[in-house]
Design a protein with these regions (language model features):
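Solvent-exposed interaction patches of small proteins and small membrane subunits
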Residues: 1-108
């Protein structure tokens, strides 16, 4: 459980990095900016790796789609060139804030 706290903090750190990477840009800019894409995909993969390490007990306590979060890591690492960047953008804009909120609530 002690490590779970660290994993959750690291996930929050990665979310913060992604938010800084995409601050002030829209989807069209993201889809045409390979440097930002690479940085974001790396952080999403890291979030997925950390999600795999969180204990089942903690996963039960935090109601987020852990399996899907971990699954993105597998796609990012094994099928990097098959990643749908539109879906990645949707993940950034729709899913990261609720994930951050859930983790922050758990850590309090």
């Amino acid at each position: 459980m002690k490590n779970d706290r660290v994993y959750c903090e690291q996930i929050l750190d990665s979310i913060g990095k992604i938010q800084r990477f995409v601050n002030g840009i829209d989807k069209d800019v993201f889809l045409n900016d390979q440097k930002t894409q690479s940085a974001v995909i790396m952080q999403l993969a890291l979030i997925g790796e950390l999600a795999k390490r969180v204990s089942e007990e903690t996963k039960t306590a935090i109601a987020v789609p852990w399996k899907e979060i971990a699954g993105f890591r597998d796609r990012a690492i094994h099928d990097y060139y098959q990643i749908d960047l539109g879906i990645a953008w949707d993940t950034i804009t729709l899913d990261l804030e609720p994930l951050a909120d859930a983790l922050q609530k758990y850590l309090k």
